[in-house]
Amino acid sequence: KNYYTWSLTDMQGYVGGYNGNSLWGMDEKLILVDGVPRNIDYISPTEISQITFLKGAQAVVLYGSRAAKGVIMITTKRGKSTDLQVDVRANTGFYVAKSYPEYLGSAEYMTLYNEARANDGLGALYSAEDIYHYGSGENPYRYANVNMYSSDYIKKAYNRSDVTAEISGGNHRAHFYTNINYLRSNDVFKIGEAKHNGTNGLNIRGNVDLTLNDFITAYVNAKVSFYSRRSANGSYYWSAASTLRPNRISPLIPLSYIDANAASAWDLVANSNNIVDGKYFLAGTQSDMTNVFGDYYASGYSKATDRSFQFDAGVNIGLDKVLKGLSFHTRFSVDYSTAYITSYNNSYATYAPTWSNNGGKDIIVGLTKYNEDKKSGVQNISGSSDNQTVLFS
């Protein structure tokens, strides 16, 4: 059983006709939170008391033309006339992949590629000696055999945790409810800046209901949320995982392979800003001057931030003394949200090794440098937006 703490994720498993984005395949549905049209992003299920779905004539009669494509009405929890109650819930769990694709290794790929060329009447591209070296595993840095689904790059599982505190109470004159929710989710990657990928979120919702006298009641609702999502620059890891040939490139090569007498090679790596763990340099080729591994290690990161504030208040007046069943309702609401992305965008150099063999030992006798290491230290801001909605009825 899945447990989520935002939006209406997986609600389609409980409500017929709801597909996660619309009602019965119809977009632009009207969403009401406590009677106010609102964006439901990041609303926590622990805040929700009831969800009602409407479609068709009854929706239009009640809410006008905006409801022609369906209505989702969310009612949040409220306080009751009880003693102070505090409820704290903590959840933690792990995302575990059921399976990962199992692609061919370099030797198998090269063998089948030669067969494909032979079927087209072409000569072999890879020699038997090359295939032997790539298949032997004797030097995976010279004879690359990259598996991007390997535990060298991604975790078997990653964590997601959240904690929620609900506080409520009151008497016949006033009662209140408060919900405080914090969540943190990590990511599957374990290399470079990507190992710091993750999401943090804080939601705080509160409301107060007042009974001023026998015929006048009032209420106040407020909600604030803060979300941030950090991610390494370079977003094409999974597409590369399914298309990058296993023999194309070794992303990291140990410095220990560089010949002690290769002075020019040592000068190049000595001036590099991106020696990984003090013992690996970023490898590249003329065709792959940058790659997804280099991006994750050296191109920086971005952080997306979302903030929102929601407030509404209303008064209900019973006018039974004037006419039985007559009442007056008024409400005012204001919603404000901002979003922006900050990032550090770096460029980096990669190095193509020139391999040789000395006494049966593979060594690097030279390096060819592509691109330059550049870290400006400038924080870039992009994707900024803000939205304000005011309602009075």
Predicted regions: what they are:
Residues K1-L30, V36-D41, T46, Q58-F311, ...:
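Membrane-proximal, glycine/serine-rich, low-complexity loop/turn segments characteristic
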Residues L54:
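Conserved residues at the C-terminal ends of beta-strands
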Residues L183, V188-G201, K223, S231-N233, ...:
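Small-side-chain secondary-structure face that scaffolds active or pore-lining regions
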